[in-house]
From Swiss-Prot:
The protein, known as: DNA-directed RNA polymerase subunit Rpo10
One GO biological process term: DNA-templated transcription
Keyword Signal: no
Gene, per the UniProt record: rpo10
Catalytic activity: RNA(n) + a ribonucleoside 5'-triphosphate = RNA(n+1) + diphosphate
Protein localization: Cytoplasm
Cofactor: Zn(2+)
Main location as per UniProt: cytoplasm
Amino acid sequence: MIIPIRCFTCGSLIGDKWEPFITRVSNGEDPGKVLDDLGVKRYCCRRMLLSHVDIIKEVIHYTRPI
């Protein structure tokens, strides 16, 4: 869905790191190196970015009108 603003486990701010992360990984950089450069050290925060699946464009087709 939408990338969370904070880590579910420790509460660290991770939402601001999503765009630089996805841009650099799309350009072929190693995800682990990118996370190190962005300062994401905790494994709980790293998994939030590494395991996120952006499916908002698929889900939005199934919303009901208000």
